[in-house]
């Protein structure tokens, strides 16, 4: 019986069944391989998409690198502009340096003119006081300052007003200016020595 079974030929139906069972097993590894290939291809495509972007980024970064030719040209241009600014600054310094001596000269001229005007005023004031001292009767011992001279002139005017109000001078003495001036000077000196001057000066 065993020999009959083993020697019995395999039927075509059984062969087809066995083949059909083996085919799914073969297809599964192939499908796994295809899936792996698809995944790899998708990863490659993603990597390739990132690749151009990276290349583009690298291109942009390369443009910003200091060693690139474009950056070198820009650096040269900026250096040229900086040099021009320096020269312009130097020109401004030279112009300002040229303007400072002129202003100093103007200040010196103004100071000289102010000093000249001050001396002229002092000289004219001294001349006016000298003329006033000639008119006002003074004593030989008088050493009057300018303020004292002005006070004495005011007192002398007051004295003259009092004399004109009185009837002491007659027509003859009034007709002679020299005699009148001498009498007035003498009277004014007496008036000063009597103490009227000191009393009036104290007010």
Swiss-Prot record:
Which segments show compositional bias classed as Basic residues? 34-43
Which CDD domains does the protein's record reference? bHLH_TS_TWIST1
| SMART domains xref list | HLH (SM00353)
The entry's localization annotation reads: Nucleus
Q: Biased-composition ranges for Low complexity?
A: 1-18
GO biological process terms, semicolon-separated: cell differentiation; muscle organ development; negative regulation of DNA-templated transcription; rhythmic process
Quote the biased-composition stretches of kind Gly residues, using this chain's numbering: 46-65, 80-100
Disordered, as annotated region: 1-105
Q: Which Pfam families match?
A: HLH
Q: Where is this region: Sufficient for transactivation activity?
A: 162-192
Q: Specify the protein name.
A: Twist-related protein 1
The organism named in the record is Callithrix jacchus
């Amino acid at each position: 019986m065993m020999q009959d079974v083993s020697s019995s030929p395999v039927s075509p139906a059984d062969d087809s069944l066995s083949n059909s069972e083996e085919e799914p097993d073969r297809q599964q590894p192939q499908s796994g391989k295809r899936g792996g290939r698809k995944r790899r291809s998708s990863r490659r495509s993603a990597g390739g998409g990132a690749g151009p972007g990276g290349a583009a980024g690298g291109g942009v970064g390369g443009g910003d690198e200091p060693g690139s030719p474009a950056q070198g040209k820009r650096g040269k241009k900026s250096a040229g502009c900086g040099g021009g600014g320096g020269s312009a600054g130097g020109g401004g310094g030279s112009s300002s340096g040229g303007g400072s001596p002129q202003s100093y000269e103007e200040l010196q001229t103004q100071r000289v003119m102010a000093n000249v005007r001050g001396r002229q005023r002092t000289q004219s004031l001294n001349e006016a006081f000298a003329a006033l001292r000639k008119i006002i009767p003074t004593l030989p011992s008088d050493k009057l300052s300018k303020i004292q001279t002005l006070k004495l002139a005011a007192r002398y005017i007051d004295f003259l007003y009092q004399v004109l109000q009185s009837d002491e001078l007659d027509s003859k003495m009034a007709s002679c200016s020299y005699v009148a001036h001498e009498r007035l000077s003498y009277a004014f000196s007496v008036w000063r020595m009597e103490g009227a001057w000191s009393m009036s000066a104290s007010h």
